[in-house]
Each structure stands twice: as structure tokens, then as C-alpha cells.
């Protein structure tokens, strides 16, 4: 078995390789003068189960993944398996308006044509899984988050909307904490009102948990609401921390701490999903 770590996930891939006592293979990469990407693998991959760990968030990451798949397949590998901790374009899992592509379907079909299996962590919408002709597994980071907060003093786990309530319920019950969600009510096509339930939060410590932090608007507003209700400590966590346009700054106007998983590497990625990935690989390689 060999673990390949692409640029976006090299740190996570290293942790996985160390835990599984497997060789970590890193690609030789450079840019041509015209900006195109060169990828080469100088390793003995013949007869191996190969696991490529890398995100498909940015266009550059997608190109790196496709070129890597093609290069690895040139060896007589036993299998080539994609693990994309953050699976990009999954929010375009259907056609919302005429003339749009179903982006996640296009990329999933490409990846499936070059691989034996695909896995990701908490995909945005499970519709994307159905677009693959090979097994596509959605792993879950709940256990990593639960382990991280197991010894942190928290009174409530909060979902910033009702859509994430089941995840919050699961985490809260595992931690033995109470939970609730912040209600969203659309006033008009430009205005959404957010309101917390009538709960006394004076002096309480709360954890806001979401699947993705992108622009951070919902999380920032949720933090503000909870602070106004008297919360003394506000933790913010998410599975995927994208932090578009440095959105962490507006979140930290009211939140005290931010902790996200390392599906996307960054300054707040101190909750690792490496054990979740290791267990998945061990199960396939058994």
C-alpha cells in the first residue's frame, strides 16, 4: 500500500501514512513557463493499492488530481483510490437554471473513470455520490469533533440553522450537552431574520457547529445573537473551513475561538480527521 499526498492535503496524508506505517509518496511538480502543471511520480507503485489524498476544491487542485490519476495508472497498480477530504463543486449538484452544468456530476464522472473508488468527508449533498460508477463513500468527521471537545467546558451545542440540527444533536448527545438551532425566517427576497430560542444563556459557554465556513456571514450573525443573549464563551467549529475573503475576522468579532478540521489546511485546522481516513483505508486494505 502507498499513500500519495497532493499539495492541498500533504500534511493530512503524512499523518495517515505514519499511522498506517505506509510509505508516503509526494509528486514531483513544477509549472511550465506558460503556467501549465507538470506532474511526475518517481516511485515503485507496481502491484500496490494506491490511495491519493488531495482536495478538489480549486481548479488547480482538480487538474493536479486528474494528472496524478493518469500518471499513477501507468504503473501496474492493484487499485487507485481517491480520498478528497473536501470535495469541491458539490454545491452545484443539480441544475438550478437552464443552461447551467451539473458541475459535481462532470467531475465525479471524470474521477470515477480513472479510479477504483472515491471517498470524501461530509460531502455537501449526497446526490453527488450517485454520479459515480465506482464506489463513492462519504466519511464523517463527527467523531473527530467529539474527541476534540470531550474535555472542553461547554453548556450548549448550537446549529446556525435547522439544516445542521441532526449533526449538532449527534455531537451534543455524545458530549452529554444540550442543543438547539437558530431559526431563520425570510422577511423578503433580501432580508433573513435570525432568532435564537428563548433560552437563558447568561454566563453559558456555547459551541456553534456547522458543516462549512465559507463567507462566514451566518456564523458571524449567530455569534452576535448568542453574545447578545449573554453567552460568556463562544466556540465556533466546522468540518470544512474555507474562510473566503478572510471571513474569520468578522467571526472573531464575537466568537472567542475557531477550530475546524484539517480537511482544508489552514491556521484554524487543529481538529484532525486522520483517524477517520485511516480507519477507512484499513477497512479497504484488510
From Swiss-Prot:
Record GO cellular component, one term: ribose phosphate diphosphokinase complex
Catalytic activity line of the entry: D-ribose 5-phosphate + ATP = 5-phospho-alpha-D-ribose 1-diphosphate + AMP + H(+)
UniProt keyword tRNA processing present: no
UniProt-annotated binding residues for Mg(2+) 2: 161
Keyword Protein biosynthesis applies: no
Record text on cofactor binding: Binds 2 Mg(2+) ions per subunit.
E.C. code: 2.7.6.1
SS bond partners: none
Primary localization class, coarse: cytoplasm
Keywords noted in UniProt: ATP-binding, Cytoplasm, Kinase, Magnesium, Metal-binding, Nucleotide biosynthesis, Nucleotide-binding, Transferase
Entries under SUPFAM superfamilies matching the protein: PRTase-like
Binding site for Mg(2+) 1: 124
Binding-site residues for ATP, renumbered to this chain: 34-36, 91-92
Residues annotated as catalytic: 184
InterPro entries according to UniProt: Pribosyltran_N (IPR029099), PRibTrfase_dom (IPR000836), PRTase-like (IPR029057), Rib-P_diPkinase (IPR005946), Rib-P_diPkinase_arc (IPR037514)
HAMAP family: RibP_PPkinase_A
Family, per entry: Belongs to the ribose-phosphate pyrophosphokinase family. Class III (archaeal) subfamily.
Function: Involved in the biosynthesis of the central metabolite phospho-alpha-D-ribosyl-1-pyrophosphate (PRPP) via the transfer of pyrophosphoryl group from ATP to 1-hydroxyl of ribose-5-phosphate (Rib-5-P).
Designated name of the protein: Ribose-phosphate pyrophosphokinase
Protein's organism: Thermoplasma acidophilum (strain ATCC 25905 / DSM 1728 / JCM 9062 / NBRC 15155 / AMRC-C165)
Protein encoded by which gene: prs
